[in-house]
Each structure stands twice: as C-alpha cells, then as structure tokens.
C-alpha cells in the first residue's frame, strides 16, 4: 500500500495527505492501461458522501507515483464499464487521463519540485494514482523565474495563482477568443491593466469598435474619437486616401493614376510655393505616399490645369469625376478630422505624439473609439495607425514599445481575402510577422476565430481561449494547441464566466484559469450602462439624436498638448506665407528602400532662404 507521508518533520497535513488506516480502494486508483499519450485508471466510486469520488472528475489533474518521479495526468473522461450503478457497496469506475508530464523532487532537501514536459518513464500496470499534491501542482505551472504577472487563479485550486510571463506574452503577440458575453472585454481590461503596471514603458493603442475600454482604464487612458481625432489627409498613403474618396467601393484605375501623378505636384507646391507645377526628379523627389503636407485647393487646381491641357475629351470625364469625389469628401462632416483647415500646417510631430503618447504624461493608453464611424473611415484610419505604429517602433530602434490591440479583429483581418481593406490587412500582417523584432506587438481579440486570417492567428504565440460554442471556431483553437494538451479543449463549450484556457509561450503548460474579478466601476462600458439606467424614457433628447444622425455635431475645440498656435488666415502657398524652418536636419539615409521615410523627418528638408 502506498502512503504519502510528510516531507519534513512538522509539515502540516493537507487535504491530499492520506492516513495509513484509510481504505485504499476509496482513495487510490491503479493504472490498467497505458499508451504513448493516455492511460486508464481503475478506481472505486465513493457511495457515502462523494468527497473522494469528486477527485476523479473531468478537468482535474492527478498524479501517478513511480517512485523517483510522479507522472501528471489530466482527467478527460470517466465512466463505468457496465453502465450500471449499485447503491450497495462500491462501484468500480474507469478514469481516462491524458499524460501531461512528470514531476521530480529537487536535488537539495526541501527544494521545490521540478516539472518537465514529456514523459521519460511511463506508468506501469498497477501503478498507484492519487490526487496531485499542491506543491506538485504549483510546479506544473511554475514559470522558472520569468518576469510574470498574476491574472487569476487555477480552476482546480483557487489557492494557487495563475501567472503568465508578461514579456513573452507581449513580445510574441497574444489572442483572446470567446463567444459574446463570456467576459472577453473584462479579461482584456485586466490584462492591459496588469501589463501597464508591470511594463511602465509600454504604450498601448486600442482599436475599440464599441467605445467600452476607456471606462475600464480611466487613470491610464486618453480617449480619441472622430470629434477629437487629428489625422490630416496628407498622412494617408494613396491606397488609404482612395478608400476614403471611393467610400469603400471599387476604385477607378484611371482616377488612381491621375492622383498618383497630381498629388506629388501639390506637395511640391506646398514646399516651394513659387515653383509652379514643376517637380524635380531625383533623391529628393516626392511621391503620392510621402507624408508631407499639401493643400486640397492645390490638388484641385492641378486637376483643372490637367483638364485644360488635354487635347482629347476622353480623359476629361475621369478628371471631372475625381474632382467631384475630392470635393465631396472634403465637405463631408464625417471626414472633418482629415480635412480640418488648420491641419494644412505640418503637425505630424504633434499628431503622432498625441496618438502614440510620446511622451505619455502618465497616460500610456490611447483608446480610439470607432462606434458610429462609417466602415470606409475605419478602414483607412486603422490602416494609417497600424502602419505608423510599426514605422515608429522600427525607427526608434526598440526604444518605443507599442502594443496595438484589435478588438473584433476579424473585421480588419478576415479569412476571406476578398473582404476587408487590403492596406489594413497588410499593415497588421507586417506587425504580426516582424513587429516583435522592433518592439511593436499585436493583441488580437475576436469572437469568431474561424473568420480571422489564419496567417495572423498563427503568429500569436499565447492564447486565452474562453467559451466557444461554434464547432468551426473550436477547430481553429485545437489546431493551435499542442497535441499533449488537446483534451483540455474539450471544455471549451462549457466553461463558465471569467474562465479561460491559456496555452502557448506565455505559460509553462496549458492552464485552465479563472480571471480576477475587476471592481464594478472598472468594468468595460460601465459609464454607458450607468447612463442608460439613470436616464428615463421621457428624458430622450430627440434634437441631439437627429444631429448625430445627420453627422453634423457642433464643432468642438481640439486640445493638442504639443501643438503650436496656427494662423488659419494664412495658408501654405500664399505669396506672403513662410513656413517655419525644419527643426531637425535630416541625415543622408532619410530614404529606406524597404520601409520608406523615417518618421523622424518624414522627408522634411529645410529650405534655403
């Protein structure tokens, strides 16, 4: 008979310790079958109070004693071979387990046990199985000194903290998946809060389609929406600008070619007001993608001049249509953040500093709220922000650590390549594939992993899988988990609130955990719920609703923490206008054939007096 005794004199006896006088058949099981990955244990069910039988339940970890080592297994099935139950005497049961690894005691007396993935000595027939010891369970999830944070407790034993290696979780990207209503947003808020506390140097940009995260991070967050966003049109690449002009519809190749030729001319007019339509070719040549300012009026003027120079009437309808699109977009109140008159000034440093929190002034999180914004605006803006995030991290040489969190990521990176916006997909894919080399990280949150681009999902090295009911979504997660932990995912469709299965680089081994409970005032979307509860039906402001419906909100002054005062009465291109000199002299390597212009200069060169 095997009896676990106290490891040292005076050690307190925990509930897994057994008394030598206890009935072995009520406490222990014996291995009756074993293959390379699984084993079957024969045991007896307790028909008195069920306290011992409760140890043999699905999802529990058990231990098989082999003398010098203890094999750890996860119960994934339990049953009776005869499918009959007797109320008299004891009932023989069979417990199916998946072999996870093995635990061995440390070399020094009193040292912590050590857990190893994989099996070096398999259980023999008749080997004794019992409830895993608390010290062994702690060893299974020990992170071996890696920088870690506590995000909850183990589902099997709430006295044991659930820790993740925060540096590995961030640096190799992570994903949080789960169906609607299981607590994804709350779990993400907890992860972000813990990450900020552990990594004060981290900047976080949240793409928030439901306007809910700002209330969960009030002391860390700066809220940005379409009313307060400053993102001038000249910072958009040609593809991104065309998405706005064509309102998400298929583009006209002839109009795009015209834009590609005329935008550099307008940019040259901004830099050299007296140069006319001449554009010097060479190392200093401007392209449609170069992020330097230009005036919409100059672009429209170039279109008019092009139409006047045409000898054939065939191309005039194309240019006329392009001019109409530009004028329509510039007058659309939904695009006020792009075409605000004062944004003609070169405010790129202030714009980037405010969005990406450089310096952060104690608020390293920017929450970009997108609820109510048209899809073509969301597509273009998300593309610009993702592209800038990567470029900033790249050219900062690792000094700027950025996390881009994508809520409902399947909207930006759908599995179907015909859907979504190609530049956004490309920008996020570049972060997923190369971002960790430069300090730009990706967090993916989705309720439909089956609809997410598998290339993006495959780059996420740590997963937090909450309840998933859809079989296709479950299959995607199963394909990402190690074979030795596949049975853990059998619980995906039945897990409770705040529960998740964590696996990947950020944890020692696959772990079923329960997230910490956040205070009620820090739950995502709390402010909106409180407003809805406090308001009454007769308090509805119909006038305000109609104004929002028409997208003509009252203009509000936008605070730019680092912006200089701009004289809106004088525009770039006016005869008496002089631009402020560039504050930084660019180096000879401003241009990079692979990544484009360095954000430090963005192609700006001081003009000679």
Region spans (language model):
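Glycine-rich phosphate-binding loop of nucleotide-binding enzymes
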Residues: 146-231, 502, 533-535, 543
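Conserved P-loop NTPase motor module
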Residues: 497-609
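Conserved beta-strand position immediately N-terminal to the Walker
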Residues: 174, 368, 443
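Conserved ATP-driven motor cores of ASCE-family P-loop NTPases powering translocation/secretion/packaging/pilus
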Residues: 247, 429-434, 438-514
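P-loop NTPase motor domains
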Residues: 211-215, 221-222, 233-430
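Substrate-engagement module of ASCE P-loop NTPases
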Residues: 194-198, 248, 388-394, 424-442, ...
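Basic- and hydrophobic-enriched, low-structure N-terminal and domain-boundary segments
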Residues: 2-177, 397-400, 415
């Amino acid at each position: 008979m095997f009896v676990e005794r106290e490891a040292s004199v005076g050690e307190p006896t925990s509930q897994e310790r057994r008394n030598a006088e206890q009935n072995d058949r009520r406490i222990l099981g014996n291995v009756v079958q074993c293959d390379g990955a699984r084993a079957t244990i024969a045991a007896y069910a307790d028909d008195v109070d069920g306290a011992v039988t409760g140890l043999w339940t699905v999802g529990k970890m058990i231990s098989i004693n082999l003398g010098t080592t203890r094999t750890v297994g996860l119960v994934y099935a339990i049953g009776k071979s005869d499918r009959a139950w007797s109320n008299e005497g004891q009932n023989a049961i069979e417990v199916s387990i998946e072999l996870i690894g093995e635990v061995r005691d440390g070399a020094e007396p009193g040292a912590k046990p050590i857990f190893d993935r994989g099996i070096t000595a398999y259980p023999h027939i008749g080997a004794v199985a019992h409830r895993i010891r608390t010290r062994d369970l702690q060893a299974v999830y020990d992170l071996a000194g890696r920088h870690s944070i506590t995000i909850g407790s183990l589902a099997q034993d709430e006295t044991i903290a659930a820790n993740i290696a925060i540096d590995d979780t961030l640096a190799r990207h992570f994903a949080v998946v789960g169906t609607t209503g299981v607590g994804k947003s709350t779990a993400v808020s907890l992860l972000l809060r813990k990450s900020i506390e552990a990594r004060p140097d981290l900047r976080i940009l949240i793409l928030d389609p439901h306007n809910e995260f700002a209330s969960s991070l009030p002391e860390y967050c700066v809220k940005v929406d379409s009313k307060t966003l400053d993102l001038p049109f000249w910072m958009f690449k040609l593809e991104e600008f065309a998405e706005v002009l064509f309102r998400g519809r298929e583009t006209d190749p002839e109009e795009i070619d015209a834009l590609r030729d005329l935008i550099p001319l307008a940019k040259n007019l901004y830099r050299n007001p007296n140069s006319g339509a001449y554009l010097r070719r060479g190392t200093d040549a401007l392209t449609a993608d170069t992020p330097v300012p230009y005036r919409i009026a100059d672009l429209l003027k170039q279109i008019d001049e092009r139409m006047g120079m045409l000898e054939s009437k065939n191309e005039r309808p194309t240019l006329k249509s392009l001019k109409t699109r530009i004028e329509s977009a510039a007058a659309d109140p939904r695009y006020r953040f792009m075409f605000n008159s004062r944004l003609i000034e070169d405010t790129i440093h202030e714009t980037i500093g405010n969005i990406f929190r450089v310096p952060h002034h104690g608020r390293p999180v920017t929450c970009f709220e997108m609820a109510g914004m048209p899809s073509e605006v969301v597509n273009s803006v998300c593309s610009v922000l993702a592209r800038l995030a990567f470029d900033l991290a790249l050219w900062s040489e690792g000094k700027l650590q950025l996390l881009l969190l994508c809520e409902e990521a399947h909207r930006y990176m759908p599995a179907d390549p015909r859907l979504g916006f190609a530049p956004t997909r490309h920008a996020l894919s570049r972060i997923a594939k190369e971002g960790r080399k430069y300090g730009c990280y990706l967090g993916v949150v989705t309720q439909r992993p089956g609809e997410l681009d598998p290339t993006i999902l495959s780059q996420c090295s740590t997963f937090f899988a909450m309840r998933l009911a859809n079989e296709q979504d479950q299959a995607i997660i199963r394909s990402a988990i190690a074979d030795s932990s596949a049975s853990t995912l059998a619980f995906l469709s039945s897990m409770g609130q705040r529960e998740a299965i964590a696996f990947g680089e950020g944890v020692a081994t696959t772990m079923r955990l329960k997230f910490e409970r956040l205070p009620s005032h820090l739950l995502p979307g709390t402010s909106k719920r409180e407003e809805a509860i406090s308001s009454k039906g007769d308090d509805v402001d119909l006038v305000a609703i109609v104004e929002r419906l028409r997208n003509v909100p009252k203009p509000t002054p936008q605070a730019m923490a680092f912006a200089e005062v701009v004289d809106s009465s004088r525009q770039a291109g006016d005869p008496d206008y002089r631009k402020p000199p560039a504050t930084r002299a660019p180096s000879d390597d401003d241009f990079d054939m692979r990544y484009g212009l360095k954000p430090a200069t963005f192609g700006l060169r001081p003009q000679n007096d």
